[in-house]
Amino acid sequence: MVATMEVAPEATSSYGILDAENDGSRLVKAKGMVEKPVAGTAPSNLAVIGRYILTPKVLNNLGKISEGAGGELQLTDAIAKEVEEGRDIYGYRFDGQRYDCGSKAGFLQATVAFALSRADLRDDLSAYLRDIVSAQIAAE
């Protein structure tokens, strides 16, 4: 099982993408997966977002696959091998707020959102953010 969410078609080259029987339901059966497909070649816009429930077989497959995108062993490729071998893999559409902590901006967004959710940090951080945003606007 992999968590997925829809991304813009132009963003598919940044993610592992699920090739699925996409009927719009929250649970979809995978036909395959591809890691960071070249723009315009993705089989869908269902991005794998880094949450997995895996069998030990998938982890064993990591030792049997070739280097993939970026010259690295890709978990996506090991999961795709499961599908190729006839095992069922499902994608579950995530519904909620997600932050891409693989990017600097996403990591900062997650950190700020987390801090603002805490009563012991919210007031001081809110005041600080107001001050620096006001200063930035005034400087423009």
Regions from the language model: what does each represent?
Residues 1-114, 119-140:
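Unchanged
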